[in-house]
């Protein structure tokens, strides 16, 4: 019998002046509508809405109702919690993904909002406008690429592979490798795929969209140390300044399973990012290559939907 498959979705219940969806949220809903057939294959979808104001029933119900309309699945469950600006997606990932390592389930973890958090950036001038458009398509290209080959992903995960993610190829396409363990992907992924990726600095580890085989992941990490924790202080360290653009929270919490020396090497990786802060962000971000061909059509989409 195949593993059951669940989708855990983190949603930011962001405060707003009027009770309506913003442009980013509308865009995400529009994308999910296109994937209704694939979405119906999930055994369960769990949506956790991290509210800026947990008591705001009107906003919670708006988000719940609008998201429900596009999630054509036999079992959809919603939950709300208080958003924590420091921990961000941790409020969802820790409890509903990380703490379930070892279960006989395949989990697709994603963010609802994607990378562009404010549609007003599309009214800005170049190059920032290009940058944010690229980021959006990088996110949704991965998202759609994962769901459209649902059976292929299942074959990989049910075969005992523990992590399924994405890398940018030099020919501007997305490659979807899998790894025997999270540790090997985090520490060796760059080396293994260095001939495929455009820039060794642009390592893409599991982040906003990733599949996990929770049972196989526990087996791959069976030698986990007794006491190795990434505490709130380290979360804060990674959340400050522009480094938050490069560090995925999902990656941080799975670091609990790494040896102390490995955590030091990850800290060094963060330090290396400090050295390139002066480099223009869009010059090093991989999405600009992956998504270049989509820019004109996305501009058209924004105009047609009155977002710009």
Indicate where each model-derived feature is located.
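ER/Golgi luminal nucleotide-sugar-dependent glycosyltransferases, focusing on the catalytic module
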Residues: 1-308
């Amino acid at each position: 019998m195949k593993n059951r498959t669940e989708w855990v979705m983190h949603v930011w219940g962001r405060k707003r002046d009027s009770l309506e969806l913003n442009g980013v949220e509308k865009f995400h809903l529009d994308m999910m509508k296109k994937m209704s057939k694939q979405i119906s294959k999930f055994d369960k979808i769990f949506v956790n809405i991290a509210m800026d104001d947990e008591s705001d029933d009107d906003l919670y119900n708006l988000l719940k109702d609008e998201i429900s309309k596009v999630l054509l699945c036999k079992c959809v469950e919603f939950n709300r919690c208080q958003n924590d600006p420091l921990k961000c997606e941790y409020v969802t990932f820790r409890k509903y993904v990380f703490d379930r390592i070892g279960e006989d389930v395949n989990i697709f973890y994603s963010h609802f909002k994607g990378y562009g958090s404010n549609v007003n950036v599309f009214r800005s001038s170049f190059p920032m406008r290009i940058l944010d458009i690229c980021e959006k398509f990088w996110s949704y290209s991965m998202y759609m690429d994962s769901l459209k080959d649902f059976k292929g992903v299942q074959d990989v995960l049910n075969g005992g592979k523990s992590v399924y993610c994405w890398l940018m190829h030099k020919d501007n396409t997305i490659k979807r490798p899998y790894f025997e363990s999270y540790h090997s992907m985090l520490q060796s992924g760059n080396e293994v795929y260095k001939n495929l990726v455009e820039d060794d600095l642009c390592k893409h580890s599991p982040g906003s969209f990733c599949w996990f085989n929770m049972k196989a992941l526990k087996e791959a990490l069976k030698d986990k140390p007794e006491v190795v924790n990434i505490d709130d202080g380290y979360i804060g360290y990674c959340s400050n300044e522009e480094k938050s653009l490069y560090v995925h929270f999902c990656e941080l919490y799975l670091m609990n399973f790494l040896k102390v020396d490995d955590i030091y090497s990850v800290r060094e990786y963060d330090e290396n990012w400090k050295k390139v802060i002066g480099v223009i962000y869009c010059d090093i971000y991989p999405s600009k290559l992956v998504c270049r061909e989509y820019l004109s059509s996305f501009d058209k989409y924004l105009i047609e939907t009155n977002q710009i």
